[in-house]
Every structure is written in C-alpha cells, then in structure tokens.
Design a protein with these regions (language model features):
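Surface-exposed assembly/interface segments
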Residues: 1-222
C-alpha cells in the first residue's frame, strides 16, 4: 500500500453562492433608498446606479430593513441576498431636498451616555444638539458627541468623555431633518424631463441606462 508524501491541496465548494452575472434580463429598479447614510445623499437621487454585489449596492444607496419605507433595500435583499443575480441598476427617487420633515427640540434622554432619536433617515448635517436646561449653546459634533446608526437605521447620540455633556443620564434637545419616504408620489416615479436642468427623472431615466452601462434593460421594477 502506497503512502502520499509531501504537501497536497484539496478544495471544497464554498457555502456562499456568488451572484450570477447576466447580460440579458437586466433588472432596473425604481424606488426609495435611505440615502441619508451616504456622505453625499444628493449624489444618489434620480441617477442610474449599477451594483454587482450586496456590499457595493449598500455602499452606493444605503440599506434598511424597513422595506415598506425603503423599497430599493428589498430589491438588494432579494437580488443579491436570496437569488444571487447581478448586476442590478437602482434609481432612487427619494430626494432629501424635497421629501423631508423637520423636527425641532426633540427631547432625548441619555442612558449611560447614549440616546436614540425617534425617527430614522436622519440627515446628519442637519443635526443640532443642545442641553435641555435653558438656552445653553449648541454642542459640537466629534467634540461633545458622536452620531452613529444602530442596526435598525436609527441615529444614536453618544456623549464623548471630556466634552460638555458631563452627566451620563442627561437630557438633550435635538433638532434635525429626516427623510420622508411617504412624501414620494407616483409622479416622482413616473418622472419626466426637468424643465430647469433638462435632466431626466423617474422612469425617463430608463433611456440613460444603455448609454451609461452598455446594458439593455430587461425587467423594470417600480
């Protein structure tokens, strides 16, 4: 009986199924995305955005488990997470300049130096934090507090040690603007040509897909 000597390599199939890339039946999905998670939310509005992986899609348009509010997140989950189909073109019509709500002086009670805002989709650049006692001056981001998202897409305020928030159970007044997906209408989906910028919006952006990506739309979801 012979024995194997030396180093040998054997490979096993991974349990992760990579996306199957297709050139026919390209999915083009219109809907709403939590673009507040992006550095520049306006960069992902009424613009065809292509993604080949789950991670790429999340980095380009954001992700939320609230599929009722953010419909493109469901497309990400189904296309990449369940069926493994790529690429997908996403067109977000939720515009933070239009579809938004303002909140003034929401009282946020900290617990252990942390507190969560009551609305998701918060636009970070709009956040103003003050102490609840009297007319104290505003607190400074990254000096007195930091902002972060929890697993459900809500914004968490955390006091920074050495900052002006000295009590771990302090109450803060927070004013901010958040996305309002409910303000998106069928007219935003249908779109057209902007009379001022002459740019395509909504479904009119279908005609931009082939010139941008050299791929022909096959399935349209809205």
């Amino acid at each position: 009986m012979g024995y194997r000597h030396g180093i040998y390599i054997s490979e096993l199939a991974t349990s992760i199924t990579p996306p199957v890339q297709v050139s026919a039946g390209l999915i083009v999905a219109f809907g709403t995305a939590p673009v507040n998670q992006l550095e520049d939310p306006a960069s992902a509005v009424n613009k065809p955005i292509i993604a080949y992986t789950y991670a790429e899609a999340v980095s380009k348009i954001g992700y939320s488990t609230n599929f009722e509010k953010y419909t493109l997140s469901e497309v990400i989950k189904v296309a990449f997470g369940i069926y493994g189909v790529a690429p997908v073109v996403f067109i977000n019509v939720l515009d933070p300049a239009k579809h938004k709500k303002d909140v003034t002086d929401e009282l946020v009670k900290l617990s252990g130096g942390k507190g969560t805002l009551s609305n998701d989709g918060v636009l970070y650049k709009s956040v103003v934090v003050k102490k609840a006692d009297g007319d104290s001056p505003g607190l400074t981001l990254d000096t007195d507090y930091v902002l972060a998202l929890d697993d459900n897409g809500y914004t968490v305020i955390t006091a920074i040690s050495g900052g002006k928030i000295t009590e771990k159970d302090a109450t803060l007044k927070v004013s901010y603007t958040h996305l309002d997906p409910g303000a998106v209408t069928k007219n935003d989906i249908i779109g057209g040509v902007d009379s001022n910028t002459k740019a395509n919006t909504g479904l009119e952006l279908l005609s931009d897909v082939y010139p941008r990506f050299k791929l022909v739309p096959g399935q349209v979801i809205a």
